[in-house]
Swiss-Prot record:
One of its GO terms (biological process) is amino acid biosynthetic process. It comes from Neisseria gonorrhoeae (strain NCCP11945). SUPFAM superfamilies: Chorismate synthase, AroC. The gene is aroC. Pathway: Metabolic intermediate biosynthesis; chorismate biosynthesis; chorismate from D-erythrose 4-phosphate and phosphoenolpyruvate: step 7/7. One of its GO terms (molecular function) is FMN binding. This is Chorismate synthase. Its cofactor is FMNH2. NADP(+) binds at R48, R54. One of its GO terms (cellular component) is cytosol.
Amino acid sequence: MAGNTFGQIFTVTTFGESHGAGLGCIIDGCPPGLELSEADIQFDLDRRKPGTSRHVTQRREADQVEILSGVFEGKTTGTPIALLIRNTNQRSKDYGNIATAFRPGHADYTYWHKYGTRDYRGGGRSSARETAARVAAGAVAKKWLKEKFGTEITAYVTQVGEKKIRFEGSEHISQNPFFAANQSQIAELEHYMDGVRKSLDSVGAKLHIEAANVPVGLGEPVFDRLDAEIAYAMMGINAVKGVEIGAGFDSVTQRGSEHGDELTPQGFLSNHSGGILGGISTGQDICVNIAIKPTSSIATPRRSIDIHGNPVELATRGRHDPCVGLRAAPIAEAMLALVLIDHALRHRAQNADVAADTPDISRSDK
């Protein structure tokens, strides 16, 4: 299997399966001298881990990270960083009924055709459990970006199924199980998700991700444009079916006089571009939206076929998220961080000596 490595200078290679002994990643290209501990990484893993509320999978995993290499006396050495997360709560017997049949909406059918074999236990490598390794790597990237530029990356859920969530303040995000920037709608969301779960069905979600204090100049036109790489990173997350940068699809109904962000000596007058022009960061906040499909694993019987092509009916057993988007915020933050650190290092490698005479107006209001 190819395609398990992300990045060009700051590279991350993930490994492991949902019901294997463990999973993890190798980070190569991390600058030396970054103070790093397991606690720095654990914070984001705890935000992502399963079993934290009745609205997510009840699989109980500590997701305790171990740093195996690349850190000495509390600082990165510049050598590869190996991170390991052991699986402790597998329940593989729940998946016996899909050993020879394909779950609708899952990667079972495509993995079988591509590789001629598959680990059917919890989806194996195709499981969203793999994203724990990305969150671990992203925590390292976030720490470096914050110390280097003051970059802050925040994600929150803006819609669950047909329920839109109003933004009331980022301080609310960590105070509820929905990663919602809103406390007044929590009871409504609790009731809604209880109904979804009781109906043996699932729903999708929409998330907003922002990166503040991003330096101007990141991105490598033409094929490695910053927005192109962000879209690539977000689409690599399980269940993501759509990505918007800035105004996104609303750009269709905007006029050019509205969409084009005007510049003044005091700063930009708007940010419909989402902080990226010509594939290069403007220094404004980078704004991304992602759409996540409903969880494919549901207890409602559905039609499918077995490996011989015979018709079957499957009801998925096991412990699953009725809305996988509820745990996606730390994953989306991690992927945006991995894009930004890689491009920051690429920019430094080629353009460290470039100095423009024009003021950086993105900083004029900060």
